[in-house]
Amino acid sequence: MMILGIETSCDETGIALYEGSSNKIIFEALYSQAEKHNLYGGVVPELAARDHINRLLPLLKNKLDEEKIQINEIEAIAYTNGPGLRGPLMVGAGFANALSYSLDIPSIPIHHMEAHLIMAKFDSPQLDYPYVSLLVSGGHTLIVKVLSAEQYKVIGQTRDCLLYTSDAADEFSC
């Protein structure tokens, strides 16, 4: 089964096509809006949403053309439904639902943070449950015990401290 993944929770437009029978990512593409938002000192949700509107279809069309895949070969669409910025999330959900409706295929909402937790199993299938994951994504920094694909327990998280990384070194800021 070929599943298209769509990620628009903040300021990056991401798509990927996954083939379940071979457990393989056929393509992935990411467009970053970082330079645009740097002008304002942070992400401007309305600008992020508008940019997703302009980027999603051309990004998908380009990758399908590159891989010589017809859009009707996609059998399901998974999209980020939270957490994230409301406007960008709505753009991704709207695009996913419109495309799934037009292709008459399922549209599957995905929790962004839970997806990060399960990726460890995708990257390392031999990994057994339970395992512990350090999850750093956007404004979230968590230590999570993953009990199964559907069950997990947060065992630690930051309160008012964000973890920042740079090319030069890792640094903590509180």
Regions flagged by a language model, labelled:
Residues 167-174:
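Single conserved hydrophobic/aromatic residue that forms the stacking wall/gate
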